[in-house]
Amino acid sequence: MELRVGNKYRLGRKIGSGSFGDIYLGANIASGEEVAIKLECVKTKHPQLHIESKFYKMMQGGVGIPSIKWCGAEGDYNVMVMELLGPSLEDLFNFCSRKFSLKTVLLLADQMISRIEYIHSKNFIHRDVKPDNFLMGLGKKGNLVYIIDFGLAKKYRDARTHQHIPYRENKNLTGTARYASINTHLGIEQSRRDDLESLGYVLMYFNLGSLPWQGLKAATKRQKYERISEKKMSTPIEVLCKGYPSEFSTYLNFCRSLRFDDKPDYSYLRQLFRNLFHRQGFSYDYVFDWNMLKFGAARNPEDVDRERREHEREERMGQLRGSATRALPPGPPTGATANRLRSAAEPVASTPASRIQPAGNTSPRAISRVDRERKVSMRLHRGAPANVSSSDLTGRQEVSRIPASQTSVPFDHLGK
């Protein structure tokens, strides 16, 4: 018997799950377009899907934001039908033998800064910036980076007056310890600067393959998080970034120098990496390391030029749509839902705060076919689950998962 949603979509196989419900592959009955269908039992104790849909409505209009196809109730379930997305950057990192080339890191950095800037422009901070929460698009949007999972997001300023939330201390650590900012470890209320500092650690994770505070042993989780904090604070930025272009240490030093309520200079940070990209002589061909491993060679110039034009057209359309959505209502409440913690790579459950490679690493390491197939359990691109983090795919339950995503400009070398 064929299961239908909204009398328009066919329900297919299950492709993921979280504590909030299950995610299925679906298809538009008329057009055959593949979609992601999220189901949540109407009797669930802590309904999340309605809150998630509010985030999407608030973020709609930005380039690359997954479009919401349909929302409503179907039988015993709350349902949200949305655009299907591809694998996460953590999945792709594993596919590439846990090392990205400098070119790929810089291409990603540019887009990731823009995603965070967009969230901040909508008056929210993400508070869980990590590779699992960035996904690639599919098809002609396969080179567009999306940001997902607003389960820990918090409103940091009033939408109308832009009054910033007050500075506070003795806060519980919220987020993922591996990428948490030093101020977060110290129990200081998070703000825009912390999302960007976390991104700096993500970029060095992509460069190095792992961070110095990974793999630390401790008797309890609390002690482990304290050891991570101590190691992070005792590792100078210059040591962390040794062997890599100075732009990475400049980025992190800039983020750590920001005051609590400062508005970061996103353009300056993007330009740091764009200038480095130019000096390295890299090409704006949108060929990431996983493309090389998948196809064995770069695409022809006609394909590259076509993709560049598509990106620029998406950008222009997104700017027009975005300007029409600024009056949308604010997102979900930021109480218990936003404060619940998630489990992933060194996840932090509400705890009290208290290999160098030359910079010329410009192409991915070859790996054997067997290794690659083993690592590709994440289903590279086609048919990959939509808006599902790596932890969903490995069966780990998440607390208060509210995936959402937004994007702004892909690596637009003609602007800014």
Swiss-Prot record:
One of its GO terms (biological process) is signal transduction. Residues 351-365 have a biased composition (Polar residues). It is found in: Cytoplasm; Nucleus. It is an enzyme of class 2 (transferase). One of its GO terms (cellular component) is nucleus. The modification Phosphothreonine is found at residue 362. Phosphorylation leads to a decrease of the catalytic activity. Monomer. Component of the circadian core oscillator, which includes the CRY proteins, CLOCK, or NPAS2, ARTNL/BMAL1 or ARTNL2/BMAL2, CSNK1D and/or CSNK1E, TIMELESS and the PER proteins. Interacts with PER1. Interacts with ANKRD6. Interacts with DBNDD2. Interacts with LRP5 and LRP6. Interacts with SOCS3. Interacts with SNAI1 (via zinc fingers). Interacts with DDX3X; this interaction greatly enhances CSNK1E affinity for ATP and DVL2 phosphorylation, but inhibits DDX3X ATPase/helicase activity. In the presence of RNA, the interaction is decreased. Casein kinases are operationally defined by their preferential utilization of acidic proteins such as caseins as substrates. Participates in Wnt signaling. Phosphorylates DVL1. Phosphorylates DVL2. Phosphorylates NEDD9/HEF1. Central component of the circadian clock. In balance with PP1, determines the circadian period length, through the regulation of the speed and rhythmicity of PER1 and PER2 phosphorylation. Controls PER1 and PER2 nuclear transport and degradation. Inhibits cytokine-induced granuloytic differentiation. This is Casein kinase I isoform epsilon. The gene is CSNK1E.
